[in-house]
């Protein structure tokens, strides 16, 4: 039994400890990337599990999220290190303001003029009353029917009278589809004589 314990290799320390030791051991001012950390751990602790790469990636991500490590430009830094860059938020940083420049005057609402976009439609009292009355009712299914044209919607100039039909019938509502081709009158023999 004593020989089994002597030949058994010492267990490797937890991954967070190995990662922090690797970053300290590499001691690079620009930080340590994942491959450098992995090579350092493989060199120092020879017997690693077969899933070493995925375990290292998972632990680096967890330590980055918890704030133990700072990740910048594909390199990892210790969070408490004095040479670690400050953590930046996402997106473009705001422009630096000139301290000597005067502050811009606040705009008054009357000087701005009309707002952006299309002006709102004027609401008629009838539409408002109908909307209030039908507020609790369920909406009907399907497409709503077309609204009938009113006299106010017509153009101010009267439209010209429709041209008479080619067959001499009174103009009326046209049927559906393409109209039949108008055939020229065939000269009769009696008219030629």
From Swiss-Prot:
PTM note: Phosphorylated by CDK, this phosphorylation prevents DNA-binding. Motility is increased when hypophosphorylated. Acetylated.
Residues of the DNA-binding region: 87-98, 113-124, 138-149, 173-184
Keywords: Acetylation, DNA-binding, Nucleus, Phosphoprotein, Repeat
Localization (cell): Nucleus, Nucleolus
This protein's record includes keyword Calcium: no
Pfam families, alphabetized: AT_hook, Linker_histone
Single GO cellular component term: nucleus
Any one of the GO BP annotations: regulation of endosperm development
Region of interest (Disordered), residue spans: 75-193
Superkingdom: Eukaryota
Main location: nucleus
Residue ranges annotated as motif Nuclear localization signal 1 (NLS): 86-92
Annotated GO MF terms: double-stranded DNA binding; nucleosomal DNA binding; sequence-specific DNA binding
Domain H15, residue spans: 11-81
Motif (Nuclear localization signal 2 (NLS)): 145-149
Function: Binds A/T-rich DNA (e.g. present in the storage gamma-zein gene promoter) with a highly dynamic distribution into the nucleus. Probably involved in endosperm development, during cells shift from a mitotic cycle to endoreduplication leading to massive synthesis of storage proteins (zeins) and starch.
Family in the record: Belongs to the histone H1/H5 family.
Miscellaneous note of the record: Confers resistance to nickel NiSO(4) when expressed in yeast (e.g. S.cerevisiae) by counterbalancing nickel impact on cell cycle associated with an increased chromatin condensation.
Protein name, per record: HMG-Y-related protein A
Gene: HMGIY2
């Amino acid at each position: 039994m004593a020989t089994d314990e002597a030949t058994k290799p010492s267990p490797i320390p937890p991954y967070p400890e190995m990662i922090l030791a690797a970053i300290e051991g590499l001691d690079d001012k620009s930080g340590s990337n994942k491959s450098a950390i992995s090579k350092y751990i493989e060199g120092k602790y020879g017997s690693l599990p077969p899933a070493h790469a995925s375990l290292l990636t998972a632990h680096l991500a967890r330590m980055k999220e918890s704030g133990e490590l700072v990740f910048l430009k594909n390199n990892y830094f210790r969070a408490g290190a004095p040479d670690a860059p400050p953590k930046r938020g996402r997106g473009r940083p705001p422009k630096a303001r000139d301290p000597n420049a005067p502050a811009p005057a606040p705009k008054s609402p009357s000087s701005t003029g009309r707002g952006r976009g299309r002006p709102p439609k004027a609401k008629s009292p009838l539409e408002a009353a109908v909307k209030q009355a039908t507020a609790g009712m369920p909406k009907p299914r399907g497409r709503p029917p077309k609204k009938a044209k009113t006299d106010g919607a017509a153009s101010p100039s009267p439209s010209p009278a429709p041209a008479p039909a080619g067959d001499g019938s009174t103009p009326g509502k046209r049927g559906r589809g393409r109209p039949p081709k108008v055939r020229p009158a065939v000269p009769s023999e009696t008219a030629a004589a």
